[in-house]
Amino acid sequence: MQYSEIMVRYGELSTKGKNRMRFINQLKRNMKHVLSIYPEVSIRADRDRAHIYLNGANYVPVAESLKQIFGIQAFSPSYKVEKSVPALEKAVQAIMVELHHEGLTFKISSKRSDHQFELDSRELNQVLGSAVFAVLPDIKAQMNHPNVNLKVEIREEAAYLSYENIKGAGGLPVGTAGKGMLMLSGGIDSPVAGYLALKRGVNIEAVHFASPPYTSPGALKKAQDLTRKLTKFGGNIQFIEVPFTEIQEEIKAKAPEAYLMTLTRRFMMRIADRIREERSGLVIINGESLGQVASQTLESMQAINAVTTTPVIRPVVTMDKLEIIDIAEKIDTFAISIQPFEDCCTIFAPDRPKTNPKIKNVEQYEARLDIEGLVARAVAGINITEITPQEESQDEVDVLIEDLL
């Protein structure tokens, strides 16, 4: 027997009252985006649950994709069966024979939405249970906590059988909490920050600062591949490439080395905020972890944050590096993050960066720079690409790495 559909149960959105259908419709859109790589699949989202119709698609990869989508509490693959007692008996017998092992206990749980069916739920439980005993006379029925709870649903068009309950990603559907601009480097931390923001329903757009020729095409592709990894949790993501070469060269030429990182990060924050404003975002998200590097002391964060009044969310701020790496490995971004491409945060990194920058000094050094002109030119030069849930090319990555060696 081959699975015909997957029944999806919603997560936290079940508590959202009058906004429930808005959350469900957003989840449906997200599922469509993520599952778009399976053209046979179709989706119906009702108030109590959603149905993923496989239409011949391979269940295994579809299920793996569903496990990643935020807003799903659990799901169950189902078999579609002719709506007749003989067909149901045959199907139930086939399933239980396949699952059977010594000591296995089972239960039949029937439910009818088609009340014209010839048997009520209790009668159907008895008939199908007897069918199981006919082929497995030694099997034991158990009403509380059986090994297998075989669910039978009688609908208008057919009957559906399921016994698995697979845990989903939980959280909220991406897009239900508004839009945020993720400051995405090529490192380990910022993709994890993006993942955690997605889990709480934030629709992220990835802002990546590129400084060619100091940063390579490989560094850009690395950031795009990290973004692609994040699409599996809620669908397409806008990737915003910011030209940052002029700004870094100006800072390098006109500011003391110890303040390079602080000034660079302040420009990044200004640009991310300008893009947020133009693209109707609500927050800025970054991967700062307290005390991990010089620019992530409380004093540095305060100096960098001073250029904006926009809320800055730091999902990994209290995590240590090993905790962040654990999540990066779980979401499959770690191997990409450690590819040997430098990003714009590392190319001009000072040997002894200021860990306690004074705002007065920072503003004095910035007075040497055309802040508004530099920011405006960077924002005017952005390049936006929509990243979709497609497979990244490992061959292309290997070629780019070879070019560095």
Curated annotation (Swiss-Prot):
It catalyses: [ThiI sulfur-carrier protein]-S-sulfanyl-L-cysteine + a uridine in tRNA + 2 reduced [2Fe-2S]-[ferredoxin] + ATP + H(+) = [ThiI sulfur-carrier protein]-L-cysteine + a 4-thiouridine in tRNA + 2 oxidized [2Fe-2S]-[ferredoxin] + AMP + diphosphate; [ThiS sulfur-carrier protein]-C-terminal Gly-Gly-AMP + S-sulfanyl-L-cysteinyl-[cysteine desulfurase] + AH2 = [ThiS sulfur-carrier protein]-C-terminal-Gly-aminoethanethioate + L-cysteinyl-[cysteine desulfurase] + A + AMP + 2 H(+). It is an enzyme of class 2 (transferase). It is found in: Cytoplasm. GO terms for molecular function: ATP binding; CCA tRNA nucleotidyltransferase activity; tRNA binding; tRNA-uracil-4 sulfurtransferase activity. The gene is thiI. PROSITE patterns: THUMP. HAMAP family: ThiI. This is Probable tRNA sulfurtransferase. InterPro entries: Rossmann-like_a/b/a_fold, ThiI_AANH, ThiI_fer, ThiI_N, THUMP_dom, THUMP_ThiI, tRNA_STrfase, tRNA_sulfurtransferase_ThiI. Catalyzes the ATP-dependent transfer of a sulfur to tRNA to produce 4-thiouridine in position 8 of tRNAs, which functions as a near-UV photosensor. Also catalyzes the transfer of sulfur to the sulfur carrier protein ThiS, forming ThiS-thiocarboxylate. This is a step in the synthesis of thiazole, in the thiamine biosynthesis pathway. The sulfur is donated as persulfide by IscS. Keywords: ATP-binding, Cytoplasm, Nucleotide-binding, RNA-binding, Thiamine biosynthesis, Transferase, tRNA-binding. Residues 60-165 form the THUMP domain. It comes from Streptococcus mutans serotype c (strain ATCC 700610 / UA159). Disulfide bonds: none annotated. The keyword Transferase applies. GO terms for biological process: thiamine biosynthetic process; thiamine diphosphate biosynthetic process; thiazole biosynthetic process; tRNA 4-thiouridine biosynthesis. ATP binds at residues 183-184, 208-209, 265, 287, 296. It comes from the Bacteria. SMART domains: THUMP. Its EC number is 2.8.1.4. Its main location: cytoplasm. GO terms for cellular component: cytosol. Pathway: Cofactor biosynthesis; thiamine diphosphate biosynthesis.
